[in-house]
Amino acid sequence: MKISTSQFKNGLKIIINDQPCSILEHEFHKPGKGQAVMRVKFRNLITGKVVDKTYKSGESVEEADIMTLEMSYLYSDGEQWQFMNSSTYEQIGINRNIVGDAKKWIIGQENCEVVIWNDEPISVEAPPFVELSIAKSDPGIKGDTVSGATKPAELETGVTIQVPLFVEEGEKIKVDTRSGEYSGRV
């Protein structure tokens, strides 16, 4: 389906150079002389690159047929990560390269958002917050409590993040997957 530049909005999925893209920002610009244009900043959903492009007012582009499904992570066999559709119970294998950064935060049974284009998964997003155990952490040094003092801690997934000094090895914590920061105790 074709969509006009006047209908652009942030988050809209369109096809550019035969690849799906998501509009991050758009701005209508009317110069004093000449035709009005729409300046668009978008992210390629396959490569992740952010690109700027200018369209003439009234131009149209193809809208991307993209589905976002909530799927539960089941297990990984090295190359393929197995996910199950939460509503149909259908299982699909997704290549580890497509899973990307989400693999740092998921260990099993988490509900992730899987983006599908042309019946193929193109990206996986971890839930915004996950609860993980601390696998390895040095004890906090008594007296080393300057405001906001932190120490490195390795999580059960192998990722190392900064946590407050009072958090100890074996504790479950809440982590913000978008920033990779400690969010609180569980």
Question: Model regions: which residues?
Answer:
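Acidic-enriched and Gly/Ser
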Residues: K2-E156, T160-V186
